[in-house]
Amino acid sequence: MAAAYAVACFGKYFDDRGVVLQTENEGVAHFAQKLYRRCGVQGTVISKERPTGPVYEFSVKDPEEVAKMLALFGHTGKEPTLRIRPENFKCQNCMQAFIATAFLCCGTMTDPEKSYNLEFLSTRHYLSQQLEAMLAEHNFHPHRALRKGANTIYIKAADHIEDLLTFMGAGGAAMRIMDQRMYNEMRNKTNRLSNCETANISKSVNAAVQVQLALSLIHISEPTRL
């Protein structure tokens, strides 16, 4: 249930009208649909064409299904400010699934060849504060800033990003960042010592993270573990 709850908290909206998640990743939209189906709530996935490319929308809008969803998460849908309910986390696996799915819904990561930066973006102030506290509780050392009206929770230290990716179930991506970091350190050391250029090895993981994370969650997010 915790993973499905993250979709509600970090999607486009979540209230008495239902829930909507928009994403450029078709796999994420269908993953959200599968999560809700496992919880006994039926949703739909549609594709919308935009100038920048297709956007995939997962939604629960049928009144009967919306009522089941709200009861499942313990919300009325009329809350003036949306806040995360700790009661929806039964164990450590729930917290892992929630944070990992939140990243699928609103997270980004830069190419580690260029810089180390992992972010969660949300327009919901209190939810962002709570997510920041969750990450801090697990020693991922997050920071928060307001950028263009959106709350940005970001982690810049490579070792903390590696730890978070491993925590979320994307251990392979964490290892690739570690490899790139070691290469960058050796390259910088070599440049300082010999003042020469070294070969540029491409190990981009940005696109791969969401794919691996979704696949990992599909395997670990059984109904008894959400």
Please describe what each predicted stretch is.
Residues 151-217:
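C-terminal regulatory or interaction extensions
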Residues 1-31:
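N-terminal ordered "arm"
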Residues 216-226:
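Residue-level detector of conserved catalytic or cofactor/ligand-binding positions
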Residues 23-181:
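DNA-contacting interfaces and partner/effector-binding or oligomerization modules
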